[in-house]
A protein has these predicted regions:
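Glycine-rich phosphate/diphosphate-binding loops that line cofactor/substrate pockets in enzymes
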Residues: 1-9
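Glycine-rich phosphate-binding loops that contact phosphosugars or nucleotide phosphates
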Residues: 12, 17, 22-154
Length: 155
């Protein structure tokens, strides 16, 4: 419903999870499988100037929360991807997004972390192996994109 109502999907994560953020955002802005209108999705992991300036001036823990503060509006969706479920910068982004009335979706590993506690919805992969968790995260990302293609494609 968020996309149908003109809201934006924001994604954040570190390392391989940052790559997943960029991959999922690209599938939404471009297309996944079905031809449909371009959808507003932004990976908060891509702007080198923002990433380095915020990290330098405020610390890496705020690299996503400062962007969320500036960009996210009530009703937007923030997807936080973290294999540990406790990445401090993703947790901070969730805290800021929650205060702004965003919908929070977490994608984590099996541990009960802060991201799972804060998320409205959390996909927890039942593994402690980083590679297996990341593989499941991109499959889940593709499933989300396929569902969105189906729903938005019907408009």
């Amino acid at each position: 419903n968020a996309l149908k109502n003109g809201r934006v999907i924001f994604l954040c994560g570190n390392g391989g999870s940052a790559a997943d953020c960029q991959h999922i955002a690209a599938e939404l802005v471009g297309r996944f499988v079905t031809e449909r209108r371009s959808l507003p999705a932004i990976a908060l992991t891509t702007d080198t100037s923002n990433l380095t300036a915020i990290s330098n001036d405020y610390g890496y823990e705020q690299v996503f929360s400062r962007q969320v503060e500036a960009l996210v509006r009530e009703g937007d969706v923030v997807i936080g991807i973290s294999t540990s479920g406790n990445s401090k910068n993703v947790v901070r982004a969730f805290e800021t997004a929650k205060a702004k009335g965003a919908i929070l979706i977490g994608m984590t590993g099996e541990k009960d972390g802060e991201i799972a506690k804060q998320a409205n919805i959390c996909l927890k992969v039942p593994s402690a192996v980083t590679a297996r968790i990341q593989e499941c995260h991109i499959i889940a990302g593709h499933m989300i994109c396929a569902y969105i293609d189906e729903v938005i494609g019907l408009e």
